[in-house]
Amino acid sequence: MPRDRKAEVEAAQKDLDFTKNTYQVEFDTTLGKIVLELYPDVAPGHCKNILGLTKIGFYDGIVFHRVIAGFMAQVGCPEGTGTGGPGYTIKQEFNNRLHEAGTLSMARTSDPNSAGSQLFLCLARTPHLDRQYTVFGKTADDQSLQVLLKIGTGQTDRNDRPLKEVKINSAKVLVTPK
């Protein structure tokens, strides 16, 4: 029987309280740590989703399967191919936050409400994505941005897959009381 990730994620989200705490996600990658601050004020559903997935260990061991220099680095497919997800989708929360270097946004198909677990981190300003994809966070500090930019400099094959595997070794939620 397949895992019911939606139920696992919902259970992991039960103790989240954006009024009492500030949450960040830390990806410990093969090239260093990326800490992401979240925007629950404009995309609470997306923030809850990444926090729940992180808490159940979904991102642990997942590879960056698509990297386009000067554009973005994509991660979050459990198969490592760009075709998989958590087994459910979430509704879009388009907002006025801009896609710029360090921005955290959700990948999706042509259906605006098809995002699940795949996310991308922008390597540069990408205005054509504004209000077309949900921005829900950004790199929390310059060190995290530098690790992300380093991921963006690796060689890739013709399908934009890194020739040298870059993966999230582990991911965790960081909680700071307000």
Descriptions of predicted regions:
Residues 1-178:
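Cyclophilin-like peptidyl-prolyl cis-trans isomerases
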